[in-house]
Design a protein with these regions (language model features):
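Extreme N-terminal starter segment of soluble prokaryotic enzymes
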Residues: 1-5, 14, 51-53, 80
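N-terminal beta1-alpha1 ligand-phosphate binding loop
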Residues: 4-24, 29
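Glycine-rich phosphate- or other oxyanion-binding loops that anchor nucleotides, phosphorylated ligands
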Residues: 35-213
Length: 213
């Protein structure tokens, strides 16, 4: 039986995913499957192939994400897989499109003598990729604030949490998948405007790409 941790930054990103997976909120910002919650009382069969799924809402930004994910990992059994789901901006990727992140960089990291965006401590390892040609694989840069302009010209995504998740997954040796829906092309005004559109706002459709068993 596989233990899967899904990570979202905001409740508005997480709530419909939790509903579709039939997860219960057991404490603020933490949801678990009923089977996971009642496993001991029901003497749940450990050979069952279904996954135990937990959903954690970390808050926005790399710092909050690092703090809340670290607390979770210290207090709970290590997951077999972490899946990060959320919105991302992009230089040129179509709004409303799902992408699978192949690698993530720290957007603010610029230290003399070191490669820009790449922390020697880790966090920029390659992520797990879905075996699905329908979803594009792209790199992502994690910033501590909303990116509205950039010198980066490549076909990439921008978020505010993934590098912290990746760094901790590398430290704890946990496989990481990240699926991002493009919410804007580096425009904060368009971000809020686009999220009014159902096909952009909804995130639960990403579950169709995942095998959670």
């Amino acid at each position: 039986m596989k233990n899967v941790l899904i990570i979202c930054a905001m409740k508005k990103e997480a709530i419909r995913i939790a509903e579709r997976l039939k997860l219960e909120e057991i404490e603020e910002n933490l949801f678990k499957s009923t089977k996971c919650k009642h496993m001991e009382e029901e003497k749940y069969n450990k050979n069952n192939k279904d996954s135990n799924i937990t959903l954690l809402i970390t808050g926005i930004g790399k710092q909050l994400t690092a703090i809340n994910l670290t607390q979770f990992l210290c207090r709970n059994e290590k997951p077999d897989l972490i899946i990060n789901i959320g919105y991302a901006g992009s230089t040129d990727i179509q709004v409303g499109k799902w992408v699978n992140i192949s690698r993530v960089y720290n957007y603010e990291w610029e230290i003399p003598g070191e490669e820009k965006y790449v922390m020697l401590a880790g966090g920029s390892q390659k992520l797990e990729l879905l075996d699905n040609s329908e979803i594009e694989k792209v790199e992502c840069y994690s910033s501590e604030s909303f990116v509205s302009e950039t010198d980066i010209e490549e076909h990439v995504a921008f978020d505010m949490e993934l590098h912290s998740i990746s760094l901790l997954c590398e430290m704890y040796e946990i496989p990481l998948i990240s699926l991002k829906k493009i919410s804007d092309n580096l425009s904060l005004d368009k971000y809020y405007e686009n999220l009014e559109e159902k096909e952009v706002f909804e995130l639960e459709s990403c579950l169709d790409y995942l095998d959670l068993n």
